[in-house]
């Protein structure tokens, strides 16, 4: 009888805010490659600066604000799509970071046929550099919370049979 080869699970931790994402890949319990992506989303600062010019003509300012908003949303979406492009073949995803960006990414992941249902944890986290993002990913995937998640998932799969 053939012995089943246990393939290593491909896991990824994604730390992100509006401008940056770190994607930490793991095979089994080992950290593989770590990718840093930077978004094209314009920062708020530039928007604030634009205000002075348009203050005199209120409606023009609003139009411009709407355009900027629209452009930012499109840029954000393409940033999330770029992140998704780095997640092929990932079995388990851990999303963490400050602010709202992770909600947008989570939403897009759940609409993706290959990745929907693969997010195992979704947490608020502080600003981090790459090294800290690696440490947090490692801590999550080697910790009890993830072990418990897998135990529960096995039970659920058995129950479904």
Predicted regions and their residues:
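Terminal alpha-helical anchor/extension segments at protein ends
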Residues: 1-161
């Amino acid at each position: 009888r053939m012995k089943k080869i246990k393939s290593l699970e491909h896991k990824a931790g994604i730390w992100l805010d509006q401008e940056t994402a770190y994607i930490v890949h793991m095979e089994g319990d080992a950290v593989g490659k770590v990718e840093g992506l930077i978004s094209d989303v314009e920062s708020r600062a530039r928007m604030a600066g634009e205000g002075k010019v348009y203050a005199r003509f209120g409606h023009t300012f609003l139009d411009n604000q709407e355009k900027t908003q629209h452009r930012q949303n499109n840029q954000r979406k393409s940033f999330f799509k770029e992140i998704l492009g780095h997640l092929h073949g990932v079995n388990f995803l851990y999303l963490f970071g400050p602010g709202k960006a992770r909600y947008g990414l989570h939403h897009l992941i759940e609409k993706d046929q290959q990745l929907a249902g693969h997010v195992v944890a979704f947490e608020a986290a502080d600003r981090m550099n790459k090294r800290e993002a690696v440490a947090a990913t490692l801590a999550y995937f080697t910790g009890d919370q993830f072990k418990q998640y897998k135990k529960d998932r096995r039970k659920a799969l058995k129950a479904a049979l």
